[in-house]
């Protein structure tokens, strides 16, 4: 397989959301390596698909338990942004690269079904652009699942609730803001949930524009992905932000494992250059996460691993790619690939090795 068609290029950072949108979001929803290694990977990927049970169909268009079973999880649009770069889409026209965390957390004072939301950009966990708290209920009159979107009065207090859910369990309604008219209504149709706001109901006054700004969200949820189309318009119907195509976010799978790097790959001057140094405790998701390889003793090797589900450009076949990158440049040194649903994947280059197993897979 030619690396011309699969090797992940260095990404140009997607255009940031403008300041007007940011204000809206805040107010509304809220030579050491040996030649024998070469550039070829010895693939040790075991294409063992996870035998996941199928969830039964919903009992109604507003089956909340079924909906939440699909909704909860983490999502990322890495392949969408990667493909746009491959296709030569101008950086300003590419979708923003966004990672979404939708974590159910019990908060009885707010509602019976509540979800902590964190969305960050460019694979940088600290680059948070939106943080919300969702509450779901069944609206019998509409025959829909109703999503109320709450902003935090103090976002910093709950910034890491996804890592420490206990901090949010006692949150009170007074610590949140909800914008009337901006609720989303979900209904199950044709094997998917479609979410939308009431037309013209969600708006705010922009002091900069000296007029109202109207928001519309259109969403599609399946068991494997969520598509999000956010748009804003002025009073004359001119679009202020948003794209024709939605952000296509796929649900991630996490993998754990290890790597080992021979010392002379990054420090050839040492007395024992043949020593293999272990990098334990790796954890990364399969939608483009990059993790630097740091040894048990804290030594930076100068290499990283990237795990990503991508599409082979010649045949349009989906693959799970495990790439070895130079940390400083993002250049791909070598990669292996497996079936996109594989439970295990690995690589052996002689001077470095790595093995990853999907969380929850049989050992």
PLM segments and residue spans:
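The N-terminal extracellular segments of secreted preproproteins, especially immediately downstream
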Residues: 4, 25-29, 51, 181, ...
């Amino acid at each position: 397989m030619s690396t011309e068609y699969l090797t992940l290029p260095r990404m140009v950072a997607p255009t940031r959301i403008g300041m007007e949108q940011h204000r809206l979001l805040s107010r509304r929803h809220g030579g050491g390596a040996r030649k024998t290694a070469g550039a070829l990977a010895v693939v040790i990927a075991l294409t063992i698909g996870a035998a996941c049970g199928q969830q039964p169909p919903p009992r109604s268009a507003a089956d909340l338990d079924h909906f939440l079973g699909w909704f909860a999880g983490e999502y990322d649009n890495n392949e969408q942004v990667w493909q746009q770069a491959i296709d030569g889409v101008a950086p300003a026209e590419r979708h923003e690269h966004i990672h979404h965390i939708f974590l159910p957390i019990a908060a009885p004072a707010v509602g019976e079904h509540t979800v902590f939301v964190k969305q960050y950009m460019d694979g940088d966990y600290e680059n948070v652009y939106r943080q919300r708290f969702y509450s779901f209920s069944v609206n019998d009159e509409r025959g829909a699942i109703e999503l109320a979107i709450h902003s935090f009065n103090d976002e910093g207090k709950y910034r890491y609730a996804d890592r420490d859910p206990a901090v949010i369990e006692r949150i009170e309604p007074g610590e949140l803001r909800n914008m009337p008219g901006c609720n989303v209504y979900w209904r199950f149709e044709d094997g998917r949930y479609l979410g939308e706001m009431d037309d013209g109901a969600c708006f705010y006054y922009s002091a900069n524009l000296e007029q109202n700004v109207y928001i519309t969200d259109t969403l599609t949820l399946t068991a494997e992905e969520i598509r999000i189309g956010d748009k804003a318009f002025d009073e004359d119907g001119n679009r202020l932000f948003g794209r024709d195509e939605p952000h296509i976010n796929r649900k991630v799978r996490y993998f754990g494992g290890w790597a080992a790097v021979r010392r002379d790959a990054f420090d050839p001057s040492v007395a024992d250059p043949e020593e293999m140094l272990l990098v334990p405790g790796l954890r990364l998701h399969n939608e483009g996460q990059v993790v630097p390889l740091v040894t048990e003793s804290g030594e930076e090797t100068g290499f990283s691993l990237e795990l990503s589900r991508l599409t082979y450009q010649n045949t349009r076949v989906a693959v799970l790619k495990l790439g070895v990158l130079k940390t400083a440049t993002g250049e791909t040194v070598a990669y292996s690939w497996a079936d996109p649903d594989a439970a295990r994947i690995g690589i052996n280059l002689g001077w470095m090795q790595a093995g990853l197993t999907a969380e929850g897979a049989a050992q």
